[in-house]
Amino acid sequence: GFGD
């Protein structure tokens, strides 16, 4: 994911 984005920013996981």
Curated annotation (Swiss-Prot):
Main location: secreted
Cellular compartment(s): Secreted
Keyword Secreted: yes
PTM remark: Ocp-2 has L-Phe instead of D-Phe.
Function: Cardioactive; has both positive chronotropic and inotropic effects on the heart. Ocp-2 is a 1000 time less active than Ocp-1.
Protein name per its UniProtKB record: Cardioactive peptide Ocp-1/Ocp-2
GO cellular component: extracellular region
Keyword Cell membrane attributed: no
Sites bearing D-phenylalanine, chain numbering: 2
Species this protein is from: Callistoctopus minor (Octopus)
Assigned keywords, A-Z: D-amino acid, Hormone, Secreted
